[in-house]
Structures are given as C-alpha cells and as structure tokens.
C-alpha cells in the first residue's frame, strides 16, 4: 500500500511585523486494494482563509533582584535625576549638615589645636632664651695667633658668663687674623671685662678690648695717646725676637712702658720691626744712643724716635 500526502494549505509569508502561521497539513489517503474510511475525513474540506494577523512588541521590563538597604542608599546617592529638559535636578544635592561633627571637621579642629599648642611651646622657649644685648659684645684685638675661640672664652670667664667667643680666621690660610669677638651675658659683665683685659698681656702681646660696634656702625676705637718723645722705632730685628725679648733688651737702659713686635695678620709671622715706649725722655735717648746699629742675633738693628702718626698723615 502506498500513501501520498499533499499539503492542503500552503504557508504564506506575512509582513515584517506580522506573525507567520502555518496549519498542520490534512492528509488524504488513497488506496488501490482497500479503502479505509475515517469519519472525520468523510466530508470534503474547504480552504480556510487566513485572517491578517498583526503583531506588536513592547520592551520587556525585568524586575531586578531585591536590593539591600545599604546598596539602595548608595545607588540613590549616586543617581542623577534629570527633568524633562535634560537638566540635573538639585533635590538630592540640597542637604543640610547634621548636628554631628564630620570626620574632616574633627581633623581640621585637631590640627588647629596642635598648631596652637606648638605656638605656645615656641613662645615659652623664646621667653626662656633671651638674646644678649648688643652692648655686651666686645672687640678683642692684638690676639696672639695661637689663641683659638675656646681659649678666648676661658680667658674672659673670669669677668662673667661668656655667651659667645669667636676668633676670626683667614678663609684662605685658615689662620687667625689676630682679633675676635666676645659676648658677655650682661652689659655690666662686658664693662668689667673691658676694665680687666684692655692692655692685658697674653703671651707677650697687649690686648685691645673695647665695645664692638653695633650693626651698621663703624667700630669704636679708643682714643690713642702718642708719646712721640718717648716712643722708639726698632727696625731690622731678627724674626725670632718676640715682645718679651724686645722688652728685655731695652730694659737695660730704663723703664720700659711697652714693647711690641709687629706681626703679619695673614701668616702670623714677624714683620721685622717693632715699637718700644720708655718712661722718660732721658731713658729714651739713652736707649737710642746705645742700641742703634748694634748686632742682635746676627742682624744690625735700627733704633730711632718713632714718627708721630698725626704728623705723618698730613703729608
């Protein structure tokens, strides 16, 4: 038995927005030897007209998972609400600070308190340390070249409390320039130091101590008295002769008030001449008459009356 089937209704194509519907084919059976009758296929079938079906679509709305209260609040804070014109709605941004102090405000306040405490401590330190007055600073000249800042401080400690002691050195040679500065704690101690150490003998050299000049002022120089008739110039003296040896040499001819060998400030070496002041004119004349042209350690010295500086500057 053979069976042939044909679809009664052909599927038809619809429009783009229409649905495609196809009906199941109905089978018609033909037999050669035997025929089978089906009650529901006994009648002839008529074609079925299809109605034009329209199909519309709408976006699907998926409901998200249930959010926790914390995540919902975070999303709400980070969401911008736009009005119909595309402008940002400011309702979410208009908020008033709560009465509780924020972390940032607390940090700023803590920093402010720390700054105030630092200022108070700095003020207390300034009150404890007071800079010595300018009038307590002294100039010390004609220092021996082997005296350093520490030795200068120890020397002036006998007059009071030494705040600062400094010997000035040459930058190139790193040798003492023969002078320095000492700052005492009070003006009274500075005045006492001037009385004690001005014309004070240190290693054969007489110190010059007076008040140092203030900032912007010229150094104060004490008035000098030149005893022209008693002051002697001594030239061509040997390099190894110091103040003490020069004084000893002239003391054989009278009372020596002062004896000084002139040294180079840069190198600290003797310049080969000096000055001697005798107590009287007679003693000065006797020393010149006996010592001029004499040999001293292999060198012939020159001895004569020292020239007055005031008269020398007039030429």
Swiss-Prot record:
CDD domains: RRM2_NsCP33_like. Disulfide bonds: none annotated. One of its GO terms (molecular function) is mRNA binding. SMART domains: RRM (SM00360). Keywords: Chloroplast, mRNA processing, Plastid, Repeat, Ribonucleoprotein, RNA-binding, Transit peptide. Residues 1-71 form a transit peptide. It is found in: Plastid, Chloroplast. It comes from the Eukaryota. Residues 115-133 have a biased composition (Acidic residues). Residues 136-214, 230-308 form the RRM domain. Its main location: plastid. GO terms for biological process: chloroplast rRNA processing; mRNA processing. GO terms for cellular component: chloroplast thylakoid membrane; ribonucleoprotein complex. Residues 114-133 are annotated as: Disordered. Could be involved in splicing and/or processing of chloroplast RNA's. PANTHER family: 31 KDA RIBONUCLEOPROTEIN, CHLOROPLASTIC (PTHR48025:SF23), OS02G0815200 PROTEIN (PTHR48025). This is 31 kDa ribonucleoprotein, chloroplastic. It comes from Nicotiana sylvestris.
């Amino acid at each position: 038995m053979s069976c042939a089937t044909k679809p009664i209704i052909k599927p038809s194509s619809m429009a783009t927005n229409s649905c495609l519907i196809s009906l199941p084919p109905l089978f018609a059976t033909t037999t050669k030897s035997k025929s089978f009758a089906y009650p529901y296929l006994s009648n002839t079938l008529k074609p079925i007209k299809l109605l034009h079906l329209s199909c519309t679509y709408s976006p699907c709305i998926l409901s998200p998972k249930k959010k926790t209260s914390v995540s919902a609040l975070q999303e709400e804070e980070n969401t911008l609400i736009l009005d119909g014109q595309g402008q940002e709605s400011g309702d979410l941004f208009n908020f008033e600070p709560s009465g509780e102090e924020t972390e940032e405000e607390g940090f700023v306040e803590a920093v402010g308190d720390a700054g105030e405490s630092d200022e108070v401590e700095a003020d207390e330190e300034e009150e404890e340390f007071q800079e010595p007055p300018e009038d307590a600073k002294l100039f010390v000249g004609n220092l021996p070249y082997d005296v350093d800042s520490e030795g200068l401080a120890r020397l002036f400690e006998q007059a009071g409390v030494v705040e600062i002691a400094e010997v000035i050195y040459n930058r190139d040679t790193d040798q003492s320039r023969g002078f320095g500065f000492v700052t005492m704690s009070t003006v009274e101690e500075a005045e006492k130091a001037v009385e004690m150490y001005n014309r004070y003998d240190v290693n054969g050299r007489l110190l010059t101590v007076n008040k140092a000049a203030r900032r912007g002022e010229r150094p104060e120089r004490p008035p000098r008295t030149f005893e022209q008739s008693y002051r002697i110039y001594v030239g061509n003296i040997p390099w190894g002769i110091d103040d003490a040896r020069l004084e000893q040499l002239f003391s054989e001819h009278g009372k020596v008030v002062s004896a000084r060998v002139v040294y180079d400030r840069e190198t600290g070496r003797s310049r080969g001449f000096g000055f001697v002041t005798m107590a009287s004119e007679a003693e000065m004349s006797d020393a010149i008459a006996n010592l001029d042209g004499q040999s001293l350690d292999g060198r012939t010295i020159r001895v004569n009356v020292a020239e007055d500086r005031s008269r020398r500057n007039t030429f």
